[in-house]
């Protein structure tokens, strides 16, 4: 045991020299890691890290790290995609490694990923992975804070409100919101595209998904509350205890309380008025669980928060990245604009849902953006039972992961995998031929219920933007990926625009 502790201390000491470069904050971080490493090494020594595998079972290849506890956290944090692709080349589709005291097993490629997407919740559990992130943001009693059977009922209620009849109403709402938002942009200039689209996504989603009462209260102060609440989706929130007095945690918790109060008032007003409005708020107010119990006001408010914020990330990042892909390829951008005239009419009348469905090139551009820049790099579950895949057995306690980003650019599956080519979907591609090669919205029991709304939202916003402006890169700069956030956003996303001549 003493040898183990000495080994851990020696390695951590070397790591401090290499990693911190004398930086005090970094040294304190490593010191904390060392303390945690002692606990980790003790558990390792006494054999309590995981139950033994069945006799004859073979563990996945393990990528050894010289740094206890932290493991590969630094290398993975700097370049996660390259790390996973290199590991795939060296070890194959299934491999394990340690970060911050947890063992992660990745399943790369469609065949290996099938284990996660086809699994039952009692074998690969989602709540134990995501609850510490989502519960402080959405609230108690919804999403990953409840048993999976209850969550599935809640998703079914929300999905019933995300229907074509509502989508038909949403198109005109989103178009009007978009036109109003871009009035402030003027004739030409340079703007932060990601910030702008994040704001617009909140405005349009709130109007469509929350109803006019809640949208009418969405001013700058409330928008900041949403931003503070959204700040709860962070690496710190996932890694650290929620009771720590961090500024971001305090802002998140205050925003949660204030937004809930806004929702409570809107819900109470709707209930008291007896007015029946055909929107998702009304759908939830009239929904019941299988046992006949109606949703409480707190559950309705939490589900509305979850519906907005879960979709906001997908739509804002995808919309922004697509803008830069179109700005880089002006020929493609012009084709998308001409498609507007071909499908909708030369005079570009107000958009309709049926026209939106026929904008096939724009649809393929969204699909290709989601392939190369999926908002979420990793989908994760906690192994509760031994699971076999590709001849290996994954022990209980492993964090089992699939990376849409890696699967969607795997060289064994995709031709010209790094090229932005929307026309690849006109022919046979892994997206249609391999079940889990293309999974930006997940698959199986946890597939995103907001996928169709996201397409309606993004297509309507970009149809309107293409009618208003031409877009260009600034001095040829195409944003790199910001891997420091949970959602992989564009770095320095400034774009140049000029109003189209009529």
UniProtKB/Swiss-Prot annotation:
Reactions performed catalytically: a 14alpha-methyl steroid + 3 reduced [NADPH--hemoprotein reductase] + 3 O2 = a Delta(14) steroid + formate + 3 oxidized [NADPH--hemoprotein reductase] + 4 H2O + 4 H(+); lanosterol + 3 reduced [NADPH--hemoprotein reductase] + 3 O2 = 4,4-dimethyl-5alpha-cholesta-8,14,24-trien-3beta-ol + formate + 3 oxidized [NADPH--hemoprotein reductase] + 4 H2O + 4 H(+); 24,25-dihydrolanosterol + 3 reduced [NADPH--hemoprotein reductase] + 3 O2 = 4,4-dimethyl-8,14-cholestadien-3beta-ol + formate + 3 oxidized [NADPH--hemoprotein reductase] + 4 H2O + 4 H(+); a 14alpha-methyl steroid + reduced [NADPH--hemoprotein reductase] + O2 = a 14alpha-hydroxymethyl steroid + oxidized [NADPH--hemoprotein reductase] + H2O + H(+)
Enzyme Commission (EC) number: 1.14.14.154
Activity regulation: Inhibited by azalanstat. Inhibited by azole antifungal agents ketoconazole, itraconazole and fluconazole.
Xref: PROSITE patterns: CYTOCHROME_P450
Membrane-related topology note: Single-pass membrane protein
Assigned protein family: Belongs to the cytochrome P450 family.
Protein name as catalogued: Lanosterol 14-alpha demethylase
Natural source organism: Bos taurus (Bovine)
């Amino acid at each position: 045991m003493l040898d183990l502790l000495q080994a851990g201390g020696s390695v951590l000491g070397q790591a401090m020299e290499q990693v911190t470069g004398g930086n005090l904050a970094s040294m304190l971080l490593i010191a904390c890691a060392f303390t945690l490493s002692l606990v980790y090494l003790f558990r390792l020594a006494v054999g309590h890290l995981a139950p033994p595998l069945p006799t004859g079972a073979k563990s996945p290849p393990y990528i050894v790290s010289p740094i206890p506890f932290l493991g590969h956290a630094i290398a993975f944090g700097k370049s996660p995609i390259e790390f996973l692709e290199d590991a795939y080349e060296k070890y194959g589709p299934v491999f394990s490694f340690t970060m911050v005291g947890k063992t992660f097993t990745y399943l790369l490629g469609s065949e290996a990923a099938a284990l996660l997407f086809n699994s039952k919740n009692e074998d690969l559990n989602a709540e134990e992975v995501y609850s510490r992130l989502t519960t402080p943001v959405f609230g108690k009693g919804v999403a990953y804070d409840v048993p999976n059977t209850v969550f599935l009922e809640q998703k079914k209620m929300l999905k019933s409100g995300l229907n074509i009849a509502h989508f038909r109403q949403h198109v005109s709402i989103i178009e009007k919101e978009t036109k109003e938002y871009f009035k402030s942009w003027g004739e030409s200039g340079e703007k932060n595209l990601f910030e702008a689209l994040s704001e617009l996504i909140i405005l349009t989603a709130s109007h469509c998904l929350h109803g006019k009462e809640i949208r009418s209260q969405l001013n700058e102060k409330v928008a900041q509350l949403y931003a503070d609440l959204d700040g709860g989706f962070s690496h710190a929130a996932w890694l650290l205890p929620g009771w720590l007095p961090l500024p971001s945690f305090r802002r998140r918790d205050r925003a949660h309380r204030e937004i809930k109060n806004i929702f409570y008032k809107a819900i109470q007003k709707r209930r008291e008025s007896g007015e029946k409005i055909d929107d998702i708020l009304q759908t939830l107010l009239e929904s019941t669980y299988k046992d006949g119990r109606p949703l409480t006001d707190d559950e309705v408010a939490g589900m509305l928060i979850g519906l907005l914020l879960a979709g906001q990330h997908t739509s804002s990042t995808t919309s922004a990245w697509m803008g830069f892909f179109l700005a880089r390829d002006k020929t493609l951008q012009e084709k998308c604009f001409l498609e507007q005239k071909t499908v909708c009419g030369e005079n570009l009348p107000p958009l309709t849902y049926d026209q939106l469905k026929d904008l096939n090139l724009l649809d393929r551009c969204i699909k290709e953006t989601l392939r190369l820049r999926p908002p979420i790099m990793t989908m994760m579950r906690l192994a509760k039972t031994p699971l076999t895949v590709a001849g290996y057995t994954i022990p209980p306690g492993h964090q089992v992961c699939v990376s849409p980003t890696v699967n969607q650019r795997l060289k064994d599956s995709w031709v010209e995998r790094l090229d932005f080519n929307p026309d690849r979907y006109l022919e046979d591609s892994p997206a249609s031929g391999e079940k889990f090669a293309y999974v930006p919205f997940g698959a199986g029991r946890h597939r995103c219920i907001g996928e169709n709304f996201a397409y309606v939202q993004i297509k309507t916003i970009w149809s309107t933007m293409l009618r208003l402006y031409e877009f260009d890169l600034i001095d040829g700069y195409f944003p790199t990926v910001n891997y420091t956030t949970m959602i992989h956003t564009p770095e320095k996303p400034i774009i140049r625009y000029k109003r189209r001549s009529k």
